[in-house]
Amino acid sequence: MWFLILFLALSLGGIDAAPPVQSRIVGGFKCEKNSQPWHVAVYRYTQYLCGGVLLDPNWVLTAAHCYDDNYKVWLGKNNLFKDEPSAQHRFVSKAIPHPGFNMSLMRKHIRFLEYDYSNDLMLLRLSKPADITDTVKPITLPTEEPKLGSTCLASGWGSITPTKFQFTDDLYCVNLKLLPNEDCAKAHIEKVTDAMLCAGEMDGGKDTCKGDSGGPLICDGVLQGITSWGHTPCGEPDMPGVYTKLNKFTSWIKDTMAKNP
């Protein structure tokens, strides 16, 4: 599981270690500069942890399995290791994972039949509002179901190979097809529910993985999913990835934001 490998990497690595084996886009391409202004880099201390999505000046949405402590975020980044004057740094004042996510699964490093990774969402409240600019912009939540067969864009930082973990400093994008959930249910022993989306290429070669977790899945121009879990090595044939289906959670997201002004 992607996030189990992420947890092990963080457990074994030091705070100031190089970025762990976690995030990657397989079979993708370098995103056009500033084309994903809502994409957020979530850090634990100085170590890249996960992706995220800016929903409004005060709130970032990411995956619950990215839960940790001492967060900070970078907004408007294209390259994680270059000084970019347009980028913004913020600390996180509060992390609110979805109450339905089973946190105990983060500590289990083996796969079991019918494990349920539902509700893999977490809201991060920024200590200071983001400044909305050409390079830092929020993205709205979906109002309708995504259509099967849609072309979806996922993005993230990290290795661009499925097994050698050759990291890229730049934000990478990949086009994925929205597939029937039955395809993911056949591929994985874990539970696939109607609160999840299935996306990838059945022929293999294109995928998201590990610390790409928490990043956006944008289908036909609309934010529809958050990268959650899948098979390792990533990009294998008949092994599409699984994403949290956001239109099932818009009420929880909006209510949580309203209750924590």
UniProtKB/Swiss-Prot annotation:
Matching PROSITE patterns: TRYPSIN_DOM, TRYPSIN_HIS, TRYPSIN_SER
Residues engaged in binding Zn(2+): H231, E236
Residues covered by region (Segment B1): 25-107
Known cofactor(s): Zn(2+)
Region (Segment A): 112-261
GO MF annotations, alphabetized: growth factor activity; metal ion binding; serine-type endopeptidase activity
Protein keywords: Disulfide bond, Glycoprotein, Growth factor, Hydrolase, Metal-binding, Protease, Serine protease, Signal, Zinc, Zymogen
Catalytic activity reported: Preferential cleavage of Arg-|-Xaa bonds in small molecule substrates. Highly selective action to release kallidin (lysyl-bradykinin) from kininogen involves hydrolysis of Met-|-Xaa or Leu-|-Xaa
Enzyme Commission number(s) from the entry: 3.4.21.35
Classification via SMART domains: Tryp_SPc
Residue ranges of the propeptide: 19-24
Disulfide bridge positions per record: C31-C173, C50-C66, C152-C219, C184-C198, C209-C234
Glycosylation sites: N102
Stretches for region Segment B2: 165-261
Top EC category: hydrolase
UniProt-annotated catalytic positions: H65 (charge relay system), D120 (charge relay system), S213 (charge relay system)
Record-annotated Peptidase S1 domain positions: 25-258
GO BP terms in the entry: proteolysis
Note accompanying the cofactor annotation: Binds 2 Zn(2+) ions per 7S complex. The Zn(2+) ions are bound at the alpha-gamma interfaces.
Signal peptide: 1-18
Subunit relationships: 7S nerve growth factor is composed of two alpha chains, a beta dimer composed of identical chains, and two gamma chains.
Note: This precursor is cleaved into segments to produce the active form of the gamma chain, which occurs naturally as combinations of either two or three segments held together by disulfide bonds: B1 and A, or B1, C and B2.
Family statement drawn from the similarity comment of this UniProt entry: Belongs to the peptidase S1 family. Kallikrein subfamily.
Protein name according to UniProt: Kallikrein 1-related peptidase b3
Source species of the chain: Mus musculus (Mouse)
